[in-house]
Amino acid sequence: MAQEQTQRAGGGEDDETTGGDGSAGQERREKLAAETDDLLDEIDDVLEENAEDFVRAYVQKGGQ
């Protein structure tokens, strides 16, 4: 069981060091960064329009 616990999940850097295509990894990182930025922008828009409703709903769901 101890051997199973030593295995890591993920490891984005390992892809490049094992001979993977570095440019493909870079493109994927850029795409994920752009998607993350888009999602954060969408969240900002919702908060700007309905901050009070958002906070009220969050607190009702058990947030602090």
UniProtKB/Swiss-Prot annotation:
Keywords: Coiled coil, Isopeptide bond, Ubl conjugation pathway. Is modified by deamidation of its C-terminal glutamine to glutamate by the deamidase Dop, a prerequisite to the subsequent pupylation process. There is a cross-link at Q64 (Isoglutamyl lysine isopeptide (Gln-Lys) (interchain with K-? in acceptor proteins)). Signal peptide: none annotated. Residues 21-58 are annotated as: ARC ATPase binding. The modification Deamidated glutamine is found at Q64. It comes from the Bacteria. Pfam families: Pup (PF05639). Residues 24-52 form a coiled coil. Residues 1-37 are annotated as: Disordered. The keyword Zinc-finger does not apply. The keyword Coiled coil applies. GO terms for biological process: modification-dependent protein catabolic process; proteasomal protein catabolic process; protein pupylation. GO terms for molecular function: proteasome binding; protein tag activity. Pathway: Protein degradation; proteasomal Pup-dependent pathway. HAMAP family: Pup. Strongly interacts with the proteasome-associated ATPase ARC through a hydrophobic interface; the interacting region of Pup lies in its C-terminal half. There is one Pup binding site per ARC hexamer ring. Belongs to the prokaryotic ubiquitin-like protein family. Protein modifier that is covalently attached to lysine residues of substrate proteins, thereby targeting them for proteasomal degradation. The tagging system is termed pupylation. The N-terminal unstructured half of Pup provides a signal required to initiate unfolding and degradation by the proteasome but is not needed for pupylation, while the C-terminal helical half of Pup interacts with ARC to target proteins to the proteasome. This is Prokaryotic ubiquitin-like protein Pup. It comes from Rhodococcus erythropolis (strain PR4 / NBRC 100887). The lineage of its organism: Bacteria, Bacillati, Actinomycetota, Actinomycetes, Mycobacteriales. The gene is pup.
